[in-house]
Amino acid sequence: METFKRLKMYYWPYRKVFMWSLLAMLLMTAITVVYPIILQITIDEIVLGRQYQLAAWVSLGFIAVMVLKGMATFFHQYLGDMFGIKSVYRLRNGLYEKLQRLSFSYYDNAKTGDLMSRLTADVEGLRFFLSYGLAELIRFGLLVAISLSVMFYYSVPLTLVTIAVLPFLAVAVYRFDKRVHPAFRGIRKSFAKLNTKVQENISGINTVKSLSREDFQISTFNKANAEYRAQYLQTSSIWSAYFPLMEFIGNTCIVALLSYGGYLVMQNQLNPGELVAFFSLVNYMMWPIMNLGFVINMFSQAKASGERLLDILEKEEDITDHPHALHKQKLTGDVHFKNVSLAYGKEQTNALCNVSFEANSGKVIGLLGPTGSGKSSVTQLLTRFYSPVGGMITIDHKPITDYSLKTLRSNIGVVLQESFLFSSTIRSNISYGRPDASMEDVIEAAKRAQAHNFIMELPDGYDTMLGERGMGLSGGQKQRIAIARAICLNPSILILDDATSAVDMQTEHSIQLALKEVMKNRTTFIVAHRISSLKHADEILVFNKGRIRERGTHHELLEKGGYYKKIYDLQYRDVKMINEPHEVG
């Protein structure tokens, strides 16, 4: 029950709804026990006692009881569903809010399919238990307690025979729960893996088809599907062994009751109607006991689901605002790195080692280096996507941890290497970071990003709906919309992380001309592999293996003849070869 205690904040606010549902269930359960009593009166008083004048009244009473039970059942079912639905609505919102707050380090290891499984299948499993299973557990206790009370009234010896069987049923139920809970946890994990395989395949379908790896993907999916099947078959074997055992114990009890009860009737120690009523009560009690396995099944599934949901809900948030964080509308944009080091994992080598530089407001800083050299790590630290393991980063002479995350990130416009567009209108995508932006602001941002012309050529212009991840646009078009989104934010600091890598040389040149105007009075970091993208920067930092190897302007670095010069020669060698005349012999 510890799992449900830790989830209490999500369902406890709706306890009044649940209590009303329980009240209706109490009435429904009490009426259920009235049926055998009416049956006993009919046999002993009307049939054997020949009081036929009571038949009409008993029939009317029986109809009234059935109507009352129907109404109680309706309210119990409706209010129970309302309790479950409202609880998981709150829970699902809490999960989604938590996912928004978790840092990049969590998503480095998380799998999309697994997260989707938790937010759908696991939440739904918990809802089903809250709506139905929890009330059934309570109903089971009530029905057994009320039935035993009436049974003791009819015959103490017969009731003791019934109670003698209960320990065997309790042991069977306990052992079933111990075996079925791990099995259902395995099912949840297998389903999450299956989800991940499907999600990865759909997301990477272009790669799969271009490399003709359909058969390989089918085989990996079949393997995951086979594991899921094996987990379900294991659970099925547990169920298959449990139900015959429960039925055998129940039937043994019934045979004992009929034998001993028949003897008591023959000895005139029990009326025939009382034996029939007693037998009906045993049936009413035995069915919930046998059905307890199904309820425990729901409980085990809900518990396994709850544990997986708590893995997210109780995950520590690495990057948060401190209690007295500064909230500012606009920052100046003076950036200072002081001996900053970064490691993405505890056992990994540092991605950055003792990096120091200054970027005053309005300056353009170029970050150049091979893949994995630490260029993008600088920008990820600046936006507090990750926290450094050493050193200090300041903006406007204050540590970035002094600012609220909202203040910091609303003043930093970022265009990542892989631009992500949402499945909404182009206008919504451009104004995503600034929802209150006017249409004029959106158009101005698009013009500066060289996106306005192709947007106007689309059938619905800025109201054109994009497909998932911007499907329907070329890579260059998506990148330009992403740049427009960053410009629309009107940030104090602009980060272009290989932002022009997906556009052709002519478009790159046009964007750079437009960005020169945008970069005025705005600190800009340009992360690039191509020297052409950042040679106009006020200072270029050349990274290699997490350290700054060289720094200076484009011309200063060329004159040094160092690492930067080697990169320059490699990138422009092909251009020189094309421009030189070749003899054709």
From Swiss-Prot:
Annotated membrane topology is: Multi-pass membrane protein
Q: Which InterPro entries match?
A: AAA+_ATPase (IPR003593), ABC1_TM_dom (IPR011527), ABC1_TM_sf (IPR036640), ABC_transporter-like_ATP-bd (IPR003439), ABC_transporter-like_CS (IPR017871), P-loop_NTPase (IPR027417), Type_1_exporter (IPR039421)
Pfam families per record: ABC_membrane, ABC_tran
Q: Where is the ABC transmembrane type-1 domain?
A: 18-301
Domain ABC transporter stretches: 335-570
User: Can you tell me where the transmembrane regions are?
Assistant: 18-38, 55-75, 128-148, 150-170, 238-258, 276-296
Q: Which PROSITE patterns match?
A: ABC_TM1F (PS50929), ABC_TRANSPORTER_1 (PS00211), ABC_TRANSPORTER_2 (PS50893)
Sorted keywords for this record are: ATP-binding, Cell membrane, Membrane, Nucleotide-binding, Transmembrane, Transmembrane helix, Transport
The processes (GO biological process) annotated in the record are: transmembrane transport
Q: Which annotated residues bind ATP? A: G369, P370, T371, G372, S373, G374, K375, S376
Task: Tell me, in one coarse class, where this protein mainly resides.
Answer: membrane
**Protein name as catalogued:** Uncharacterized ABC transporter ATP-binding protein YknU
Q: What's the source species' lineage?
A: Bacteria, Bacillati, Bacillota, Bacilli, Bacillales
Gene encoding the protein: yknU
